[in-house]
Amino acid sequence: MRIIITFARMKRLFYLLSALFLLSCSVEPEHFTIDVLNGYTPVKSQGSTNLCWAYAMLAAIETEHIMQGDSVHLSVAWVERMMAEDSTVRSQRGMGQTLLNMIGRYGLVPYDAMKRADDIPPRFAFMLGATYTPQEFAHSVCAPGEYIGLGTTDDEPYNAFFTPDLPDNWEHNQLYNVPADSLLSITERAVRQHHGVCWEGDTSEPGFDWKRGVARESLISGSTTDDHCMAIVGLARDAEGEPFFIMKNSWGTKNPYDGLLFLSYGYFLRKTVAVYLPTCLVSR
């Protein structure tokens, strides 16, 4: 009997210590004050694909339309399927401009028309009682030249286009070069004016913490790599008043903010590769 009681107590002690350990490992989410939060469709997961650029750029286009009162939900699966069937496509990786090029080439369909890449591609797209070909539908949600890609580098002249030498830029797309401070102010103004924005940058830094849902510049290396794309859907401030962009990611919803992430202005200044936003917002 004594052995049984001791064993039972040991079990209870084990469960208690396990609970305390898990509690100590859990992180209390940081508190942010939301200044601007633009509309967006549900956060998705890109799974094992390299299509973050497609998720992010389509999310920016969706936000642009949602804030204009349109109900738009777009299919990444369509783009994935069309690329897989195109022998000229060199890589599944890409940049925001890659998505714009792809829908210009293949067209686009609504999310409900094709949710998975192995679904049968529809011949037509239907929205608000109208029937479109995929090319017509793509043009209706994103006209050619509607978006521009901005970058910032000291190695090229400002206020001019340059071709970034990046593995993901296998199409040799160009970015319009602006000073870093201008890139930040243009992006912030776009979000405040309720426009959709796609961000591309370095997420390999220790300061980028997906599990906590926060990216800060406190721990940053000197080099910048082109790792990931996200949509910018809002603006916020932390408890100390530091400004942040609210990012819509494509890694599912298992973080403290249901798939959103708060990225500091300091991180943006030092780790941005490109930003894609409506061309009308940029004076050239």
Question: What is the meaning of each model-derived region?
Answer:
Residues 72-139:
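Papain-like cysteine protease catalytic cores
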Residues 23-24:
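C-terminal motif of bacterial Sec signal peptides marking the signal peptidase cleavage site
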Residues 28, 41, 130-284:
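Active-site signature of cysteine proteases
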Residues 28-38:
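N-terminal regions that are enriched for targeting/export leaders
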Residues 51-54, 77-82, 99-102, 110-112, ...:
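Structural recognition of the beta-strand scaffold that forms the well-ordered cores
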Residues 11-16:
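Sec-dependent signal peptide recognition
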Residues 47-62, 89-101, 228:
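Active-site nucleophilic cysteine motif
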